A protein has these predicted regions:
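H-loop (His-switch) and adjacent beta-strand-loop-beta switch element
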Residues: 213-225
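ABC family nucleotide-binding domain
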Residues: 4-215
Length: 225
């Protein structure tokens, strides 16, 4: 029997009030299972990123609850939620978000520095070996390719062994071949370490490889392509 890791109960999101109010996400339920790869797909402005941010603890819903390991993350205070994001959740963004003044190594290890934990050197070696950037750890982001920068961002998201990883258009700034290779490495790494992966993508070929496909149309959650 599969275990739930994330559950959204009647979540919705409305921006503004009165006549100017815009409903970005209509009341919906969603369940994500432990260890699965789920994709979120839909047209631009359909509500994909809004849903991802709500599920990841970055944007409170207007209504509803988000349960991570059975705990309502938006019932937590700011400090508790920040701790959950640092220890249980990993994020990968389209624009990499690497610090230019830091080495690749330090960029990857930022989750440990923020949480005052001792870096996991064994995990660092294993991840960077799988991702093919072990020889780039002393370089600055400007000294490596876009594909390598995104691999560093993937390593940063996974190295703290989060329960769940959210990726918002992780291949959006990469060419087709590099994007395919990067996505393959991301799914392989998440599977290797037993992490649940939720990816927002506009690419149906990437979406089709997921165990669960979540389609967003005009703020409504629809399962499947």
């Amino acid at each position: 029997m599969k275990d739930k890791i994330l559950e959204a109960v009647q979540i919705s999101k409305t921006y503004g009030e009165g006549e100017s109010a815009v409903q970005a996400l209509k009341a919906s339920d969603l369940t994500i299972w432990k260890g699965e790869f789920a994709s979120i797909i839909g047209s631009s402005g359909s509500g994909k990123s809004t849903l991802l941010k709500i599920l990841g603890g970055l944007l409170p819903p207007t209504t509803g609850n988000v349960l991570l390991d059975g705990q309502d993350i938006y019932a937590m205070n700011a400090e508790q939620l920040a701790q959950v994001r640092r220890q249980k959740i990993g994020f990968i963004f389209q624009d990499f978000r690497l610090f230019p003044e830091y080495t690749v190594r330090d960029n990857i290890l930022i989750p440990f520095y923020l949480d005052h934990r001792t870096p996991d050197e064994q995990m660092l070696r294993k991840l960077t070996g799988i991702l093919g950037i072990a020889e780039k750890l002393d370089a600055r982001p400007s000294q490596i390719s876009g594909g390598q920068q995104q691999r560093a961002a993937i390593a940063r998201a996974l190295i703290g062994k989060p329960r769940i990883v959210f990726a918002d258009e992780p291949t959006g700034n990469l060419d087709t071949r590099t994007g395919e290779d990067t996505m393959k490495l991301l799914t392989e790494c998440a599977a290797e370490f037993g992490q649940t992966l939720i990816v927002v993508t506009h690419n149906p070929e990437i979406a089709k490889k997921a165990q669960q496909i979540i389609r967003i149309e005009d703020g409504c959650i629809i399962k499947g392509l």
